[in-house]
């Protein structure tokens, strides 16, 4: 379905009925998925039924299966858990139970089932599907349904969404709930860090994941933990000595805390469990450190879903409905999943098979294979963790020196990138300098050499510890060149926003005049606006979306209490509408006005009328987002006046400008990890380039590929020369000419009930799992 026109789509679901249920352990984001499936189903003209209490409700029927309308799923996107309930069900594992379930579905004409749950729930759904024909035959012979009914509903379609905080399902990069669980873990680690530092303590943290170490691995990366235990990679024999040596070493270097992260399913080489108690006693006996154990438990399943989980679930929920509509008796039951930032469909049983293979490999002690089978994302995380945790200060120095600076406005994750870049540089033997206050600081010679321990504890700090300025190098080129010569700098790593990219472009264009600028340069895009060309995501935008989303959740709550109130919220981002659009999806906004999607007075009129209609229903609140520069005349004040006067007597209006709140507090797990990875990746690339351009005792780099922007593009991390990106950049509005996230706007409008054409909806292709699906961290 590359494109379908609106009228046709409005009826593609006509006469079809979709049932949606959540099963197994709950996960944050399930509600967003239920909401998206329900609304997309209604949008295409199908009937949608909510099945309460998972498979138990399916078997028992009656009041547990209710037809939903548009408002049934209003105001649930921000809630954790699942509002339709979930239960582990014994009855469904028996044939009688499944026969009862089939009867309950046929009674309501439901032949499409969307199951949101873990691998057990999805396997159950597939068994149900394969038995469907024979179950109906049994119902006919029992006289419960007629032959004709069995003919009409002869086929059951299944689409699965994986809801599991463990991220233990093969074929999908991220499962629903994983990112939120990481948020909970990082909140706890940040809180524990302060108490551990006060008392010089060691903490052993036990995180969930019986058979899968994903949460433990990623939180260890994002917190800079000293030691990690995961089931996929049991420690070598004699690990007790290595661990105690490492802990003693970091203490003697001046660290006041040690963090050890252990997955609940951690084992040693012989398959014997390693318990958090055992690790604690070991540290106390061998080192005499004051040690505490904290078991995180079900805290990890709780709380509000993160922005990533809300958007992921919404996207996958819509895709699941499309998959059900396009299913035929010959297509396999599918799982809708994410690969990079693209939705794909995978055959359900291939995924389940792969997931079983991992467990089998672990049982048979083929641990390296288990890590490979987990998929690209897991393996990359593991490799980068090993690289960072085993890095040492190099004994041998190279002749190279590099400088790191922050440019633009503060963005979360900058410090994580600086930390990993500094340590990677030092471990490769380079001399590493940091520059305070951006290009201006480079001109004023605010340059200092940095040591391993100077960046300790930077990972979880928000903002910019180096200090950052927006000034471009053009004004003081002479001074900058003089200081590059003075410190003999061979490479520049610039971490920052649009100014960082523009600044490096100016330096490259001045190479003809100054030989000193013929050095290796790399830009790590870091800005809440996500407006730097050469990457799909810039560092700090995930934190910004979460910050804006939390504010909007509170604003929505205020509007719900006041009744008949519309809030107009202004987001940052310059001309780039990324923040407004993505936050809009995450909070279920009624509209988001952005510069890239031009709107006129007709559109505004339609939106106000939509709002007036909405106030006649039981949802008496509205939320409209507006990017700060979406229109020169239709300002926030103009919108406020328009909505106020048009809504007179129906609703009243308030405005809220979020401002610098959006820069966020502590970085989100995504930004910590993304920053860490880009820092390492950039240094590896710069070292290779330096060795390649080193001639007769000096560095001379003037090729276009020696000054690049590093970024995530679809599924791979790529380096794009700044000179080549120039043609793809709209300098007047400071953003890329092409933006991938514009297709998300369709989702925003559909889920807010606008009559729009689906001609632009591109559905996910069916892929196969055996082609090791690459992922967000590919290439590390």
Swiss-Prot record:
Binding residues annotated for substrate, in chain numbering: 164-166, 201, 208-210, 264, 292, 298-301
Pathway(s) it belongs to: Carbohydrate degradation; glycolysis; D-glyceraldehyde 3-phosphate and glycerone phosphate from D-glucose: step 3/4
SUPFAM superfamilies: Phosphofructokinase
Swiss-Prot/TrEMBL catalytic activity: beta-D-fructose 6-phosphate + ATP = beta-D-fructose 1,6-bisphosphate + ADP + H(+)
Chain positions recorded as beta-D-fructose 2,6-bisphosphate binding sites: 470, 527-531, 565, 572-574, 628, 654, 660-663, 734
N-acetylalanine PTM sites in chain numbering: 2
Family to which the UniProt record says this protein belongs: Belongs to the phosphofructokinase type A (PFKA) family. ATP-dependent PFK group I subfamily. Eukaryotic two domain clade 'E' sub-subfamily.
Record protein name field: ATP-dependent 6-phosphofructokinase, liver type
Gene source species: Bos taurus (Bovine)
Protein's gene: PFKL
